[in-house]
């Protein structure tokens, strides 16, 4: 096979049918069921999700971030508020994430609005992070900004390591914290044979995401 030609790369999907009668009324309950199955399938980082945002000039941008919590209210992730995504979400909170669970022929897309988490939630999670990751948050104060070279980053990290040696509590930087992506629309995709995939979309029609009414529609593949 000529791997230089993407058109020659094909994969047959053989996922089980997605029966609408078995879908949970609430999308985050359905997400919980699928996320559990993705973890049980021992996928590499099933909590990895592609986050898409819109820059102040209207240009889209995307990157992979890690899901760090979820419930019926939405999905939680953490970042540097000064990063490209942090700045984008501060100005335009609309965003979407994709969970690409290729190995089990599934994908979940969540569209919604990002809200900053409270200082209490941010402090609690930051305190749980490995010591090295805490230092990294301080060393990369202006995430996404250009740096001269790797040595500049290493020097910044070394200064932080000297200031907070192992066993020393590391405070959370004020520019570091989390977001809650509050869902407004969620799509579940199950790969099927002959590209006749099963797709179901949840759309919030009234109330809050956690207790409101969701309309479920089958979408054409």
From Swiss-Prot:
Pfam families: PNP_phzG_C (PF10590), PNPOx_N (PF01243). FMN binds at residues 63-68, 78-79, 84-85, 107, 143-144, 189, 199. GO terms for molecular function: FMN binding; pyridoxamine phosphate oxidase activity. Substrate binds at residues 10-13, 68, 125, 129, 133, 195-197. Residues 1-21 are annotated as: Disordered. Binds 1 FMN per subunit. Catalyzes the oxidation of either pyridoxine 5'-phosphate (PNP) or pyridoxamine 5'-phosphate (PMP) into pyridoxal 5'-phosphate (PLP). Its EC number is 1.4.3.5. Its cofactor is FMN. PANTHER family: PYRIDOXINE-5'-PHOSPHATE OXIDASE, PYRIDOXINE-5-PHOSPHATE OXIDASE. InterPro entries: Pyridox_Oxase (IPR000659), Pyridox_Oxase_CS (IPR019740), Pyridox_Oxase_N (IPR011576), Pyridoxamine_oxidase_dimer_C (IPR019576), Split_barrel_FMN-bd (IPR012349). This is Pyridoxine/pyridoxamine 5'-phosphate oxidase. It comes from Thermobifida fusca (strain YX). Pathway: Cofactor metabolism; pyridoxal 5'-phosphate salvage; pyridoxal 5'-phosphate from pyridoxamine 5'-phosphate: step 1/1; Cofactor metabolism; pyridoxal 5'-phosphate salvage; pyridoxal 5'-phosphate from pyridoxine 5'-phosphate: step 1/1. The lineage of its organism: Bacteria, Bacillati, Actinomycetota, Actinomycetes, Streptosporangiales. Gene3D superfamilies: Electron Transport, Fmn-binding Protein, Chain A. It catalyses: pyridoxamine 5'-phosphate + O2 + H2O = pyridoxal 5'-phosphate + H2O2 + NH4(+); pyridoxine 5'-phosphate + O2 = pyridoxal 5'-phosphate + H2O2.
């Amino acid at each position: 096979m000529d791997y230089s030609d993407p058109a020659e790369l094909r994969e047959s999907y053989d996922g089980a049918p997605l029966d609408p009668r078995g879908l949970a009324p609430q999308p985050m309950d359905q997400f919980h069921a699928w996320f559990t199955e993705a973890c049980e399938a021992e996928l590499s980082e099933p909590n990895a999700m592609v986050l898409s945002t819109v820059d102040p000039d209207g240009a889209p941008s995307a990157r992979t971030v890690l899901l760090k919590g979820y419930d019926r209210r939405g999905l939680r992730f953490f970042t540097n508020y000064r990063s490209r995504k942090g700045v984008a979400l501060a100005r335009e909170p609309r965003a979407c994430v994709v969970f690409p669970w290729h190995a089990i022929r599934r994908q979940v897309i969540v569209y919604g609005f990002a809200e900053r988490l409270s200082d209490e939630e941010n402090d609690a999670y930051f305190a749980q992070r490995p010591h090295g990751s805490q230092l990294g948050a301080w060393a990369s104060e202006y995430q996404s900004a250009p740096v001269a070279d790797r040595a500049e980053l290493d020097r910044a990290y070394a200064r932080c390591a000297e200031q907070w040696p192992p066993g020393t509590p590391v405070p959370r930087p004020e520019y570091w914290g989390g977001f809650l992506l509050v869902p407004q629309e969620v799509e579940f995709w199950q790969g099927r044979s002959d590209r006749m995939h099963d797709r179901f979309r949840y759309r919030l029609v009234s109330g809050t995401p956690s207790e409101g009414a969701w309309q479920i529609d089958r979408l054409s593949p």
